[in-house]
Amino acid sequence: CQVDLLPRAHGSAMFTRGQTQVIGTTTLGPLSDKQIIDNLTGETERRFMHHYNFPPYSVGEIGRMGAPGRREIGHGKLGERALSYVLPSEAEFPYTILCFSYVVESNGSSSQASICANCMSLMSAGVPIKGIVSGIAMGLITNDPSRSPDKKDNHYTILTDIQGLEDHFGDMDFKCAGTEKGLTALQMDIKIHGVTREVLHEALEQANKARAEIRAAIAAVIPEPRKEVSKYAPKMVTFQIPTEKIRDVIGKGGETIQGMIRECDGAEIDVEADGTITIYHHNQEMIDKAKAMIDDITREAKVGEIFEGEVTRVEDYGAFVNLFGDTDGLCHVSRLKWDYVDNASSIVKVGDTLKVV
């Protein structure tokens, strides 16, 4: 096991077991990067995606590398299911998460190696997963493949961590993945009529021991997720504003929010209908700047607060002082001086600084 293999990736790891080796990478993005799926039942969103790549050179062959095939899509979905159960909620970790598995060498069980590799890459990226996920492929050899192994004269052997030949000539490929608390994904392919409860129980017991050894090997390299995301990953801050202030933040035709984005070096600002605002940017200073601008827009002056602002307009009856953002307050002419004042312009002018309550 090895982590931080690729320095510029948000998270990376390499997992090797025998003659199978997989490099896993994790990329973090804003929630607006979710994959939108438009199907017959309506639109759905995917916040976590796992892609599995099995190039021909991983098994010593030469071939074209085009669109993913059925096998690659299936293995990707299996890994996605195995890892999805330990991911933090969107509220806990408001990022879109994309994992890639690159099989660079394969002699069986590459789908389970991809689960182990990307479990480490998630922790390397600072994703606060709930536990270490490990996977193993179990096999079965019977002396009469035409019959179920429940016959007394049909002896069988259960194999742990099957190789390519054992997968090809064997009677079962049983993929098991999960944490120390339980299983998160199972997939069984069999070439015989079925398996008994005894065989299934024995296979799961052996798989549990093997997965525990793999978890220990992973924990020796990276025992828990990093406390912070990579410096190359987008930083973010989430906060709440009153729903009635959303229109002020967005502005007419999006003018206000677009101006903030330009002024903050392209910071991404997500505004939800419930008033939740999330700001993403690689530079923390730009995030702080965008948040301060939104705070100024949504802030309301309270009785008793003291402000020091610039005079923006002077009328006979008083002076208008900028309190914060685009909010001005009127300082009545009677408050400018203890004595009687006929005209505010005789006391202050535009550009002066006043401390007001």
Per-range role (PLM):
Residues 51-59, 90-94, 177-182, 193, ...:
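Flexible hinge/switch segments at interdomain interfaces of large molecular machines
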Residues 33-55, 61-64, 113, 191-221, ...:
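Conserved glycine-bearing catalytic or ligand-binding loops at nucleotide- and phosphate-handling centers
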Residues 122-227:
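Mobile "lid/hinge" segments at catalytic clefts and subdomain interfaces of large enzymes
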Residues 12, 35-38, 135-136, 157-163, ...:
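Short beta-alpha junctions and helix-cap segments that line functional grooves
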Residues 234, 238, 243-357:
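Single-stranded RNA-binding regions, centering on S1/OB-family and related RNA-binding modules
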Residues 10-95, 182-192, 196-201:
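Glycine-rich, flexible beta-strand/loop modules in the N-terminal catalytic cores of phosphate-handling
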Residues 1-41, 234-248, 256, 263-264:
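Extended amphipathic alpha-helical scaffolds
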Residues 30, 55-60, 80-93, 99, ...:
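Conserved helix-loop functional segments at active or binding sites
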